[in-house]
């Protein structure tokens, strides 16, 4: 069976989409190819790397990437993680399903916000898996 493709998108591909890619690979990796991208590329936030390391997921080798049109158009599901990405998501072909899962941006906030958003993303992906 071929794996489906899920593409997580946020503004800068720095925090939320990076954590979603890490969780997605861990939770959905048997059934889904998991990618992330951004409307812009801001670099992976070191606190996002640390937050995921705290739960045993290494995203230190991730890179911050602009949305890849090839991945976007070949995805089965595109998930926007912030309102900016939701509003500015490129037009998708009819074959690509899009969902919006909004999460607060932890960038520039206290450590506890990174942990909270990380855990909320995990819960959303676990919930998605059981649909």
UniProtKB/Swiss-Prot annotation:
Domain of life: Bacteria
Keyword Cytoplasm set for record: yes
Active-site residues, Swiss-Prot/TrEMBL: 10 (nucleophile), 82 (nucleophile), 89 (nucleophile)
GO BP terms in the entry: response to arsenic-containing substance
Cystine pairings recorded for this chain: 10-82, 82-89
UniProt-listed Pfam families: LMWPc
GO molecular function, one term: protein tyrosine phosphatase activity
Reaction(s) this enzyme catalyzes, per UniProt: arsenate + [thioredoxin]-dithiol + H(+) = arsenite + [thioredoxin]-disulfide + H2O
EC number: 1.20.4.4
Entry-linked InterPro entries: Arsenate_reductase_ArsC (IPR014064), Ptyr_pPase (IPR023485), Ptyr_pPase_sf (IPR036196)
Main location (coarse class): cytoplasm
Any GO CC annotation of this UniProt entry: cytoplasm
Purpose: Catalyzes the reduction of arsenate [As(V)] to arsenite [As(III)].
Xref: NCBIfam families: arsC_pI258_fam, PRK13530.1
Family assignment from sequence similarity: Belongs to the low molecular weight phosphotyrosine protein phosphatase family. Thioredoxin-coupled ArsC subfamily.
The protein, known as: Arsenate reductase 2
Species this chain originates from: Staphylococcus epidermidis (strain ATCC 35984 / DSM 28319 / BCRC 17069 / CCUG 31568 / BM 3577 / RP62A)
Organism classification: Bacteria, Bacillati, Bacillota, Bacilli, Bacillales
